[in-house]
Amino acid sequence: ISAAAALAAPTLALAQARPIRLVVPYAPGGPIDVTARLMAERVKDSLGTVIIDNKPGGGGNIGADIVAKAAPDGLTIGIAAVATHAINPWLFSKMPYDAAKDFAPITQMLRVPNVLVMNADTATRLKINTLQDLIAYAKANPARLNYGSGGNGSAGHLAGEMFKRDAGIFAVHIPYNGGNPAQLALLSGQ
């Protein structure tokens, strides 16, 4: 965060007169959104007001494209992620931006791990207590399990597909419009 503040110093006078728009290409409430909000609060004394603008959709492409096409005045910055800059160029035949040329990096804010979790009530009902139990259940009950992710092509989606391949199981992928909606569906037993 300190590095982000230092790199943004040339726009400090302008940023204090007008707010900085921080585009988050994912749904509100997810880990990247929460991190962006914490960062905005942390830098407000040195950079002025930072407004979070969530623009989910297209695996992050909608928000990233807004940043790519913004005026280069330092007042619009964005969160880049694995999906927007490493995965999507391989998934989409026509990208609205060039991930390598249309952005200038500021700093790495965080690393987000992929975690495999299951609704506790469902796990109890199916007698799944370990990863081995989950794999055994999936093999004995093909196509009975679903898994959710923050969207098609997201890191969670690709991690789920790799897990299925490596475990030799099948589960139906349910893409959500962001990690937070996927988490809410999980907690509610969907």
Locations of the language-model features?
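Oxidoreductase and adenylate-handling cofactor-binding alpha/beta cores
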Residues: 131, 157-170
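Aromatic/hydrophobic pocket-lining residues that form π-stacking "cages" and hydrophobic walls in ligand
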Residues: 36, 134, 160
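N-terminal (or domain-start) structured segment
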Residues: 14-102, 144, 152, 164, ...
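Short coil/turn segments
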Residues: 27-29, 82, 111, 120-128, ...
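N-terminal export signals
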Residues: 1-13
